[in-house]
Amino acid sequence: MLIITGTGVTNVSLMWQQPLLMERNGIILGFVVRLSRVTSRDTIELTTAYTNITVAPLTPYTLYECVVAAYTSVGTGPFSSIIFTRTEPTSKSY
């Protein structure tokens, strides 16, 4: 399960759990994280060995689609369900 743990003006923090042992196709080597801008489909793809990441720099007040997948020596597994998040605006109006 992928969750948003924080958002800023130019960053998003994500956290997830490893796949269950019976769902793995070998030893997990790492994770692929993808964030796509909803309006333009521009995509950022990162890899990490950890189950959390902060992605930056992102565009302020922009809606992103986020997914994550584990990978092994066999290849990349299925991506998680899509979650959406929006970065914060550069300034707040009162």
Language model features: what each stretch is:
Residues 1-94:
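Extracellular low-complexity, O-glycosylation-prone stalks/linkers
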